[in-house]
A protein has these predicted regions:
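A short, Lys/Arg-rich alpha-helix, primarily the initiator
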Residues: 1-20
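Short, charged recognition helix plus adjacent turn
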Residues: 9, 15, 34, 61-74
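Residue-level detection of the helix-turn-helix DNA-binding "recognition helix"
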Residues: 12, 37-38, 51
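Short alpha-helical DNA-recognition segment
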Residues: 15-33
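The DNA-recognition helices of helix-turn-helix-type DNA-binding domains
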Residues: 28, 39, 64-67
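Short, solvent-exposed alpha-helical "recognition" segments
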Residues: 38-44
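DNA major-groove recognition helix of helix-turn-helix/homeodomain DNA-binding modules
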Residues: 44-60
Length: 74
């Protein structure tokens, strides 16, 4: 799972711009592009992003955890 790509896709799905997102995060566009390149994101930042985009990005980690637990039972 690559959370940065998932965040970028959700931003596109909502029709939001990188400039808008950067303003909401109180950072510049360069930092937003760096977030898009990350495979993982600090939980506090992910929480802020989830609130800004009204999208639960933690569910992707929960889903992955459930899949991992299912594999261990086999």
């Amino acid at each position: 799972m690559h959370i940065g790509k998932i965040i970028r896709q959700e931003l596109r799905n909502q029709g939001r711009t990188v400039t808008w997102f950067a303003k909401c995060l109180y950072c510049d566009r360069t930092n937003v592009y760096k977030i898009f390149q990350r495979e993982s994101v600090d939980s506090e930042l992910l929480y802020r992003i989830s609130r800004i985009l009204s999208h639960d990005f933690f569910k992707y980690y929960s889903r992955e955890l459930e899949e991992d637990e299912g594999e261990e039972e086999i």
